[in-house]
Every structure is written in structure tokens, then in C-alpha cells.
């Protein structure tokens, strides 16, 4: 009996040690670095002008192509960055204009609309126009007014897309967000700055449910990323777009 009691006690001790060891390892597992964005696992991409098209684009379903910029310098004018009209047959494409100002003059509007028509006439499956602008959260009402003007000028055959900031969901005025969402068809919220994922992006993701419109998340190729479980359950979440980096 005594031997059995000693055996049971020794077994209990081993079990306790095993549990303690498991508990000790858990924080180490939680500290593991997040995953990295693998472009090969996605089918929607940003391709900036001057970036050589990688092989991953062969399986793309959606491609956002930078056409030009409207820069902050005076006067406001369109600066073309793509030397030729693209010819893409296997994927839907968006014509992207990067803008640093909202006071567009008539020549700018005419040039952008003419480029849209040229891209469509070349046989592309052109979804529409994407405006890439870092609108500050406190200025969303002004941006919404600009987007309403863009929607008014765009022929109905073209959709309107915008990029946005994750901070919109945390601090954006509800009325301004609703006005913005009423005129756009596609929103891509950027989770990166430059070539890196924004530090602490997880905190922003927790407030995405406040957004009153569907959205996608823009990820930078090779950047840190770990999707929270709640994201897949958000009815407004429409997937990812990967920003491809120069090779």
C-alpha cells in the first residue's frame, strides 16, 4: 500500500510539473512574432508605377494600377506616372490617382476622365477610379464633399474607390463617415506606412465594426500581419489588397 501511495504521489508530482512547464511556455508562445504577408496567398494587389509586375499578378482577380498624381505644388495639375495604357485581360483593374490636394481644376478632371476612357477603350475590364488620399480623421467632412463632386463627374459606368486610414474607425465623425460611405463603392483601409505595417495595428482593428460601409484592408507585402478572429465575422469586411514592393 505504501509503495502504491508513493507511486501515486510521484505521478501527481510529475503531472504538476508538466502543467507548470506548460504554463511557463505559454507566454513565450504568445510572444512569437506575427505572420508575414505572403502575396502568393492573395488575389488583389496594388501595383505602383515603375514597379515591375511580379509573377503573382498572373493569378490576380483585381489590380489597382497607379496612373498619376495631383501634387501639392502650385498650380494644381495632373502628373502622369505610367508611360502607356495597360492591357490586362485576366483581371479587373482600377485606375488609381494619388492626390495631395482637393482643389482640382477643370484640366485635372478632364485628364483623369480621359484616361479612364482610354483604359476602357483598350479592352481592359475597368472597374473605375480609385483616389488615394490620406484624409485626416478630423477633415472627413471636407473629403466627403470632394468625393460627392467626383461621383457627380464620373460616368455611371465607373465605380468610385478610395483608400483610407484605420484611424477613421476609432475617431471619425459618424455623420462624415456616413456621408463618405454614401458616395463610394470601394474602400481600402491601409494598415501600413511606407514598407512597414503600422505598429499597434491590432488596436485599430478592434474599432472597425464602427464603420458604416464595406471595406477591404490594404496589407504591405512582407509586412507583419495577424488577423484577429473577429475580423472574419465582420459583415463589412471584404478581404485584402496587397501593396507590392519593388524587387
Regions found by a protein language model. Give the residues of each.
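Secreted glycan hydrolases and related glycan-binding modules that recognize and/or cleave
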Residues: 11, 22-247
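Sec-dependent bacterial lipoprotein signal peptides
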Residues: 1-21
